[in-house]
């Protein structure tokens, strides 16, 4: 059902079973796929694609221009996957030409009120962003990350899978997977054991990650030495992912 007060461009592609509430504005070249519900006063701008089964709450703004002074109206996009919940006043900006040109959001994410996803961000799946969580431009977020309220991530940072970011945290560097980060200049505060247990990590896998965590963050060893010991003494795919994340970091890691 489409409310009579909604303004929908003739070149927007809206699947027949999409619900659109009152006073929504949907611009040209927007794609909205089946089963999605768009509540009142939502603005979706040109070049946005929204997948199946999403629920978008009032006053969300998706696909707006990037907050980048070099942007001159180029044709860039926002791609949003399936089954996402996007709450009130969320803003998701389109990409920039000098970035990837696309801002991407995966599947099954819960993006709470006033959260912001800036230009060229790549957000994975099963991510939770609490109220006012903010991602600056070019941030990459892996799957199953949780952001507390009012946290902020610096441009070009990466957040590893299963990380937990506490509320009011400022993130100036990459956050490795599986850890808890907190503080105005984020520091590691342990392994995210509760999150790992909820996602069926075995006791043995968690124990190995704890050993790696202690070497990385609770020893006085240089980072390269810690990584060398981990690679020589610890095994498993999660260890490999942890080491690969750290060794490919360009900004350095929170430590």
Segments from the language model and where they lie:
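Structural signal for interior beta-strand "rungs" in well-ordered beta-sheet cores
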Residues: 1-182, 186-187
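Terminal amphipathic alpha-helical/low-complexity segments used for targeting or macromolecular assembly
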Residues: 1-5, 10-11, 16-17, 53, ...
């Amino acid at each position: 059902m489409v409310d009579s007060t909604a303004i929908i461009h003739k070149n927007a592609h809206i699947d027949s079973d999409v619900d659109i509430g009152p006073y929504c504005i949907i611009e040209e070249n927007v794609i909205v796929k089946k089963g999605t519900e768009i509540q009142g006063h939502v603005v979706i701008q040109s070049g946005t694609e929204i997948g199946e089964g999403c629920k978008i709450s009032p006053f969300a703004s998706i696909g707006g221009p990037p907050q980048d002074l070099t942007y001159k109206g180029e044709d860039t996009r926002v791609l949003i996957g399936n089954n996402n919940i996007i709450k009130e006043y969320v803003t998701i900006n389109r990409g920039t030409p000098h970035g990837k040109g696309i801002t991407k959001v995966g599947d099954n994410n819960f993006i709470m009120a006033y959260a912001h996803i800036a230009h060229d961000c790549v957000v994975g799946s099963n991510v939770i962003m609490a109220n006012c969580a903010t991602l600056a431009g070019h941030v990459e977020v892996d799957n199953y990350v949780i952001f507390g309220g009012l946290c902020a991530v610096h441009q070009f940072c990466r957040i590893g899978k299963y990380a937990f970011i506490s509320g009011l945290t400022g993130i100036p560097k990459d956050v490795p997977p599986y850890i808890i980060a907190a503080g105005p200049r984020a520091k590691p505060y342990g392994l995210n054991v509760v999150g790992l247990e909820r996602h069926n990590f075995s006791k043995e896998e968690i124990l190995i990650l704890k050993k790696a965590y202690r070497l990385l963050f609770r020893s006085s060893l240089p980072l390269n030495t810690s990584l060398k010991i981990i690679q020589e003494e610890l095994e498993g795919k999660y260890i490999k992912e942890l080491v690969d994340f750290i060794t490919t970091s360009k900004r350095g890691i929170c430590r």
